[in-house]
């Protein structure tokens, strides 16, 4: 069986038009989703094969306000998401339930985009929306950041993305650093999903295939997208290839027993 899913990551900044209308301007509107507007989003499409849980990157699409209006950006995201009515589909985010999906829903409401049926469907779907912040921080008082999780798995996403100030870059309409940050985040979330699935299944193949697939996909982009190309020669890739080969060759026990997860 082949399950199709996507990883979604959204960058948002303060919307001055909304902020001007509120009386409580504490902290300049920081960390208040209703005052934010979406400025960039990346969707990483992937497949997940059963019975072993092998993951494969199918592609990354990125949309931003340098090329699209916000109405067009939201419509493009809606088109790229898998159909929530498909019981085999899956949406993966990092803090998506509290931020990404909330911002997208609220902006769609503000812009009268009530017909975005995939966004609406995933907004209410809980079982197949995998928000990894709960996997990596469910027992701690403070949720782990995506940068912390990436460091746990062996990579510095802020180094890869050159740690831009998203709000300042968006105001200056300097979209390259925003896109770079967004794409690195969505790739890191995909790797985190691979490790989470490997733990859930008791088998290294989801993690190993996530690393190798992302590396192979990014290798072709290295000349024009070095921030993603860096994933192709990461020190963990050789280890992932060896673990994947051992599992496929029957040299490494698989705790999932070939059962779907």
Regions found by a protein language model. Name each.
Residues 1-261:
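DEDD superfamily 3′-5′ metal-dependent exonuclease/proofreading module
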